[in-house]
Amino acid sequence: MTDRYARQILVEQLGETGQQKLEKSSVIVVGAGGLGSPALTYLAAAGVGHLGLIDMDTVAASNLNRQFLHGERDVGRSKADSALDTLKAQNSEIEIRAFDERLTVENASTLLAGYDIILGAVDSFETRFAINQACVTLGTPYIDGGVNGFSGSVLYSHPPDLPCLNCIFPTGSSNKRNTGVLGTTAGTIGVTMANLALLTLLGLPNPLRGKLFLYDGLRMRADLIDIQRNEACPVCGIG
């Protein structure tokens, strides 16, 4: 155990046993942008032993207000390659794999198989639904995040016990990209996703079981609202 984790090992709910759990754990994050940057950064810093990331986009100047895995010199580069370099420089003691390809319904299960938890950190509902469908098929917990302006949400999904993304956001939901987003909103939601992943990996109580986390940065408040499975859901339902 290296000194880099010494301070978090002092946390009562973690300790050396918890750190060893993290070292043996695996998480994959779809998206290395505004949500993926904080989520991946803090999962790597915490010592999650096996990280994966998927992103087929390239770095644009308009990304730099919130996507801090990338810098000015990375504009035009593959986000997957840029994020991989940054994360390796941050923590060389963990395994990190990067996939520079588009995730689709057809390849999602193959790309996401074998991980303990899957994080969806993308702005496309089409991709989020593809991740969700794969997670239902694989039986893997899914943490989904979304942001818009000063607002954001986090959903923890693990059917058949908990609602899936499709139960809460029907497939007709807006797929509009290029909505306004503040860097601090993306940071708050991305860190919340990472924190929830750590709670799950450590076997600690999950406050988002059957709840949807809603964040309002304008009013500086967060709320948990009750959610339920849709038994007629075409993805996870029984009907």
Locate the predicted segments by residue.
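Adenine nucleotide-associated cytosolic modules
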Residues: M1-G239
